[in-house]
Each structure stands twice: as C-alpha cells, then as structure tokens.
C-alpha cells in the first residue's frame, strides 16, 4: 500500500457514500466497515484492530487497519461529519499519531492517518498541517517513526508528513 492507494481509497469511500440517500456518515464507526471491505477487496491481507505495545501502557493499543505483505502498512481513520467539527485537527488525533509513530519498521513500512472530510467546507493544507506541527509524540525512550497524514475531501486532497521529533 502506498500514499496514492490510500488517497484513492478515501476518494472511493466518498463516492460510495454519495450513492446513499441518507449516508451512514455521521460517525467513524459507520464508515469503518465500508473502508475495511474496500481495503480487503483491494489488498487482501488486511486485518482490523492490530495490537501494538505502547511503553507505560498495561494493555496493547489497537490500530484500525494493518495491510500485510512485503511492504506492510498500518492506518488509522478519522472522519469529520457533514455537520462539521474539529475532529480532523492535530489535537483530537494526538493518540492516533502516538500509536502510529510507535509501530516498528518491522511491523510497518508506512504509517498513515487517513482523514475523511464530509463537511461542506474543506481544510487547506497549511491550516491542517499547522495544527499537526504542535503535536509531539510524548515522553519516553522509544523509537519514533514519521506518520503520513492523508486528507480527502470531495474538492480537495493532499498529504503531508508528521514528524514525531518536533
């Protein structure tokens, strides 16, 4: 899985949701099964709720998706509803970024936070990236890896790299 394929998956989900008169798009957990089915059909070796150990945590954290194969990837999903909210900004996604950046390179070569925006107005790359620049990976001695943030809206799509070393 690469960035172009993740972006294409996000765009396809937006198109699939438009086929519904009343789309199931008000919460992330209603879009999650649609994305899982799409990815399972496209990539095959997809697992949900992949466990990752986090320093200082009693039990492992869960990441939404892991795509296996010779170039494994992990992905978290965040959705902004048609009613709007700040759920795609950096602050609300701190825990997702921290989980993703702690996945070792043996478990995943690519770490992606997929942001699907269903609101009428879209974010600009500068505004969204600025909200992620202030987020850090947290304290502790552990290896941190960068995370690719992929934003998908019907009228705008872009991606940028979030560095855990800011």
Give the role of each language-model region:
Residues 26, 30, 34, 60, ...:
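Short, well-structured alpha-helical interface segments that form or flank functional binding sites
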Residues 45-74:
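Active-site metal-binding core of divalent-cation-utilizing nuclease and nuclease-like domains
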Residues 22, 84-87, 122-123:
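A generic structural signal for short coil/turn motifs at secondary-structure boundaries
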Residues 2-52:
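Acidic-basic catalytic patches of nuclease active cores, encompassing PD-(D/E)XK
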Residues 65-84, 100:
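Conserved catalytic cores of phosphodiester-cleaving nucleases, focusing on short active-site segments
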Residues 82-104:
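Mg2+/Mn2+-dependent nuclease catalytic core
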Residues 107-110:
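A short helix->loop->beta-strand "cap" motif at the edges of active sites that frequently abuts
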Residues 112-166:
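Domain-level recognition of nuclease-like catalytic cores that cleave nucleotide substrates
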């Amino acid at each position: 899985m690469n960035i172009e394929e993740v972006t294409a998956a996000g765009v396809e989900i937006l198109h699939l949701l438009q086929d519904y008169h009343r789309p199931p798009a008000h919460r992330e957990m209603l879009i999650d099964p649609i994305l899982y089915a799409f990815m399972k059909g496209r990539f095959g070796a997809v697992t949900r709720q992949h466990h990752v150990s986090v320093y200082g945590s009693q039990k492992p954290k869960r990441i939404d998706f892991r795509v296996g194969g010779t170039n494994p990837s992990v992905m978290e999903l965040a959705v902004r509803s048609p009613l709007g909210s700040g759920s795609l900004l950096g602050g609300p996604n701190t825990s997702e970024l921290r989980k993703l950046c702690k996945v070792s390179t043996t478990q995943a070569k690519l770490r992606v936070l997929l942001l699907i925006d269903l609101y009428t107005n879209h974010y600009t790359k500068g505004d969204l990236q600025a909200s992620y620049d202030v987020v850090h990976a947290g304290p502790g001695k552990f290896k941190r890896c960068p995370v690719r943030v992929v934003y998908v809206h019907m009228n705008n799509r872009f991606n940028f790299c979030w560095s855990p070393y800011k």
